[in-house]
């Protein structure tokens, strides 16, 4: 339909997990048990499709910082409690997300990957900044601040010896995550964003940098989803 929602559901039974990531951030933090008043209308479309399609398995993801009332509505509608998984178990990125699924999921531990492990060796000069840096302290995850914005998050410069904070769907305006390398500050490249989301190198190549940053920041961490889908093999073996 014209509003982006489905007018009717498929009549077949899907053999693969039905996946959905409803709008995050502000939309995800406001919730209602009524589709008519919910800001995140897509979630209730997801529920409708689940009931009509009746897939064997399903998976839904949203931000861990969402309001408890919204989380409870989702859990009530889906009949399962969410599992908290941080992407730091599989990548150099801290990214806590809630996953609702009827697939059994094993506990995962934080891995040893750090931001330094995903950095490119040779980076174009266009990614570097010349803004002054303050509060340089190489013992901290946020090891400096770059004086270019009034937004505290955009000022943060990350230490490559630590994990990177959560990637977000930014397009430009110096909002990209920044790293301190050899005494200089630069934004992370799109390829480094891909690696933090465990995508293949240059997976998003072919579109503008801004579009790449936005798409990658909006996406899932691939290895987290692969970890969840391992549970499908457990189900198959039991059956």
What residue spans do the PLM features occupy?
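Conserved active-site and SAM-binding loop architecture
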Residues: 1-239
């Amino acid at each position: 339909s014209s509003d982006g929602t489905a007018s009717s559901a498929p009549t077949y039974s899907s053999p693969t997990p039905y996946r959905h990531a409803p709008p995050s951030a502000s939309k995800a933090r406001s919730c209602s048990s009524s589709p008519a008043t919910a800001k995140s209308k897509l979630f209730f479309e997801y529920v409708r499709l689940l009931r009509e399609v009746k897939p064997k398995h399903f998976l839904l993801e949203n931000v861990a910082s969402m309001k408890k009332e919204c989380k409870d509505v989702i859990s009530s509608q889906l009949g399962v409690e969410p599992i908290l998984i941080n992407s730091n178990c599989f990548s150099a990125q801290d990214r806590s997300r809630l996953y609702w699924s009827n697939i059994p999921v094993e506990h995962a531990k934080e891995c040893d990957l750090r931001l330094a492990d995903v950095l490119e060796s040779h980076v174009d000069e266009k990614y570097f900044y010349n803004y002054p840096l303050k509060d340089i302290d190489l013992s901290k995850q946020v090891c400096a601040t770059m004086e270019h914005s009034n937004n505290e998050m955009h000022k943060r410069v990350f230490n490559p010896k630590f994990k990177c904070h959560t990637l977000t769907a930014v397009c430009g305006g110096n909002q990209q995550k920044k790293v301190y390398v050899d005494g200089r500050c630069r934004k992370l490249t799109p390829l480094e964003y891909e690696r933090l989301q465990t995508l293949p190198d240059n997976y998003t190549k072919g579109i503008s940098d801004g579009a790449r940053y936005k798409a990658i920041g909006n996406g899932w961490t691939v290895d987290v989803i692969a970890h969840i889908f391992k549970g499908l093999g457990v189900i198959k073996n039991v059956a």
